Amino acid sequence: MLNIFRLRLGALLHFLIAIGHLICLFFLEEAFKAYGILDEMKHLCFGQEWLLFVVTVCLAVGFAIAGLYALSVAGDLRKLPLRRMVMIVIVGLYSIRVIVGIDWLLYEFTYLQFFSTLVPALLVYCYLPGLK
């Protein structure tokens, strides 16, 4: 029962993150500035402003799909393909994100970076039952 709650919580967090990314579309440049990644994102998108929006929408879709997989593993949705592999990838990617985030925090602590590391750590905790 606790494992199902954890998976549902992880799904909820992913849906909230996806909605947050979509909301950021209205002030995308300011959001990138707040995270200090504006120059990196512009370089990544070859200076094409419209690609920043496409990347953000794709990220939102990816977060929503991750939430759907958590609900599928919890038994709330039909079984999606490659559930176990997708759960392993999600936990693996977020584990790497947590390790990198801790390294950044040791270098320069900011509350934004702290919460940007805490949320992936919580998602790893929520998605671990899906590996069984």
Annotated model-derived regions:
Residues 1-18:
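Cytosolic juxtamembrane helix and N-cap/initiation of the first transmembrane helix
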Residues 20-55:
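Interfacial loop at the N-terminal end of multi-pass membrane proteins
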Residues 55-69, 119-121:
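Core segments of transmembrane alpha-helices
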Residues 85-101:
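Hydrophobic alpha-helical membrane segments
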Residues 99-114, 131-132:
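Membrane-helix boundary connector in multi-pass membrane proteins
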Residues 121-132:
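Membrane-water interface at the C-terminal end of transmembrane alpha helices
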